[in-house]
Design a protein with these regions (language model features):
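Core alpha/beta nucleotide-donor-binding catalytic domains of modification enzymes
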Residues: 7-195
Length: 195
């Protein structure tokens, strides 16, 4: 896969939703931060992986409310869906409305023989997010996986006959390609995020 990074700035004419204190994403983010606060420098810039979907949008809004001026949105354009350019436009408009820098990387995520398209896209995505985080000198990169994703991953592993190591839950914190990734929403059901 190849990576080309470009910056996007688009002015949006739409109002930007703001999270409230009772928002499940904000509450989950605050609870998660209480456990990892010592690992976060007071002035660290933080990445949010932004696909343009409801879950990552909600996480971006919560993170922006929690750390105004410190958030960078990271979008990976896989080019695998016809709507991929529409996602970039949505992300650019959202970030412009928030005043959050958006960094878009285009990757060639075609799968190799013996590799599933999902695995190829995931491999390219994590490598690209790590490259973006390194280039921007970011602290952690926040991912929007939630409780429903945990269940889906477990069921998929069971259906593939995974052994005990393959049935482990998604970690809330991990390192990959030299970058630190956090999943602060793992305890939040998907529908609660989309409220």
């Amino acid at each position: 896969w190849t990576v080309v990074t470009t910056g996007c700035k688009v002015m949006a004419g739409l109002p930007t939703p703001r999270p409230t204190a009772s928002n499940p994403c904000t509450a989950a983010l605050d609870a998660f931060i209480a456990t990892v606060q010592p690992a976060l420098d007071a002035d660290s810039r933080i990445g949010v992986a932004l696909s343009g979907g409801a879950d990552s949008t909600a996480l971006l809004l919560a993170a922006h409310a929690r750390w105004p001026g410190r958030i960078h949105a990271l979008h990976v354009h896989h080019g695998l869906q016809a709507a991929a350019d529409t996602f970039v436009t949505h992300c650019a408009q959202l970030c412009a409305g928030l005043g959050v820098p958006l960094h878009v990387s285009h990757v060639d995520a075609r799968h190799q023989p013996g590799q599933s398209p999902e695995d190829a896209a995931r491999t390219a995505r994590y490598a690209t997010l790590a490259q973006q985080a390194s280039a921007l000198a970011l602290g952690p990169v926040l991912l929007a996986q939630h409780a429903d994703d945990q269940v889906e991953t477990l069921l998929l592993a069971l259906s593939r006959g995974a052994g005990l190591p393959g049935l482990a839950a998604m970690p809330a914190q991990f390192k990959r390609h030299g970058a630190t990734f956090w999943r602060p929403l793992l305890q939040v059901p998907g529908p609660a995020i989309r409220e």
